[in-house]
Amino acid sequence: MQKLITFAVPCYNSAAYMRHCIETLLSAGEQAEIILVDDGSVKDETPAICDEYAAQYPTIIKAIHQENGGHGEGVNQGIRNATGLYYKVV
């Protein structure tokens, strides 16, 4: 079944507010796909949080880790991996 919407969340050292963002997006349920794009975070727990949620919600969340390429590359990585009918960057 195709997801209705893909939410892409480009992240860079974003641990302080990631959980709130992800928990809010999870309210969309199985109709949504959430792609967490870790853009080379090194100063906090961003990569671990991405992996934690991807393991906990494997049918909804995908974690992608890449070298730092900036916000635009995070958005593009989300587009390349999106399967939803609609696409939204958060």
What residues fall within each predicted segment?
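A conserved acidic beta->alpha catalytic loop
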Residues: D38-A48
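Conserved short acidic donor-positioning loop in nucleotide-sugar-dependent glycosyltransferases
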Residues: L25, D39-S41, G69
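Cell-envelope/extracellular polymer assembly enzymes that use nucleotide-activated donors
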Residues: K3-T6, E33
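Active-site beta-to-alpha loop of glycosyltransferases that engages the nucleotide-sugar donor
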Residues: V9-I22, G40-S41
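Short, acidic, metal-binding catalytic loop of nucleotide-sugar glycosyltransferases
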Residues: E23-A32
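Short aromatic/hydrophobic "clamp" motif used to bind/position activated sugar donors
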Residues: Y87
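Glycine-rich, basic loop-to-helix element that forms the pyrophosphate-binding segment
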Residues: Q66-A82
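Catalytic metal- and UDP-sugar-binding loop of GT-A-like glycosyltransferases, i.e.
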Residues: V90
